[in-house]
């Protein structure tokens, strides 16, 4: 099988490519140049996609004896990931750029080009598993190492994309084993640190970066009753659940800290309140997609049991979900996902992604439109 190995320059993608070669596939390595911005390309940057990463990817391919190419996807990345990130924050939502990159770059643009060039699959170093059912249909599942599992950020993959995806690290019990294997194979990235920052914000200062991209205007911080309790330098720099950076001139009556409950970009207001008000047990999602073929209840509209996860390394909680068909004022029909949580979650923000699981299987995902407490709504 002809396999295109996406080489990030890290240890995971290097070992994944090595295993693909060892399995007898015809492997070609490619590194994606995703940015021309000096901040992400300079030596010493903490994000990914740096000059050092490109060199590390080349060295790994050289050790493995496979061809190496660099593909420039910087313009598409800027439009589909970076600009989307800016637009979402400007609208008062909290996006996940890694999911957007997987959805539109690594498993859309990259896979499309790979298929056009005659490759059968794209191989990455993600910790996730593709299982083929009895009818030959792919299913996305968690990796053996749940501590490193990345199935959440792959929940955006479609049935067709999963058919052409290869995750050689699926059954690896730990990251330590991956590093040990890299050492045995003579790969120089064996002890390279993991990258945790947003790649286009390498210094980790998201608020500072956004301040350069979005016009920030001073506005009011109000409590849940609408009373002004402070001022902010720009509502777009905040997210639901945040406490740090709030400059409150009026302390809470009970003396307890307050957290961001809501962002109102049109009013340029940040709503704050006690931590207890962050708890939600109903999520309504838009832009719904299914990882593989959807389960039967999706077509019938029946409620189904599942687990819901709202962060890449968050704990999944028991839930029920159903599809809700709505008609807009202009007569257009749309379908939303309604998720009811058995255990309330805190700090869930519009723009985040909810991913649904049954056991280890990823069912699908949706972008969170609203999140609320059914118990408080009933009062």
From Swiss-Prot:
Subcellular location(s) of the protein: Cytoplasm
Enzyme class: transferase
One Gene Ontology cellular component annotation held by this UniProt entry: cytoplasm
Catalyses which reaction(s): S-sulfanyl-L-cysteinyl-[protein] + uridine(34) in tRNA + AH2 + ATP = 2-thiouridine(34) in tRNA + L-cysteinyl-[protein] + A + AMP + diphosphate + H(+)
Keywords, ordered alphabetically: ATP-binding, Cytoplasm, Disulfide bond, Nucleotide-binding, RNA-binding, Transferase, tRNA processing, tRNA-binding
A UniProt-annotated Pfam family: tRNA_Me_trans_M
Interaction with tRNA: annotated segments: 148-150
SUPFAM superfamilies tied to this protein: Adenine nucleotide alpha hydrolases-like (SSF52402)
Annotated disulfide bonds: 101-199
Role noted for this protein: Catalyzes the 2-thiolation of uridine at the wobble position (U34) of tRNA, leading to the formation of s(2)U34.
Sites marked Interaction with tRNA: 126, 352
HAMAP family per the UniProt record, alphabetical: tRNA_thiouridyl_MnmA (MF_00144)
Enzyme Commission code: 2.8.1.13
Highest taxon above the source species: Bacteria
Annotated organism of origin: Arthrobacter sp. (strain FB24)
Family: Belongs to the MnmA/TRMU family.
Residues binding ATP, per UniProt: 6-13, 32, 125
Stored PANTHER family: MITOCHONDRIAL TRNA-SPECIFIC 2-THIOURIDYLASE 1, TRNA 5-METHYLAMINOMETHYL-2-THIOURIDYLATE -METHYLTRANSFERASE
Gene Ontology terms for molecular function: ATP binding; tRNA binding; tRNA-uridine 2-sulfurtransferase activity
Name recorded for this polypeptide: tRNA-specific 2-thiouridylase MnmA
GO BP terms, alphabetized: tRNA wobble position uridine thiolation
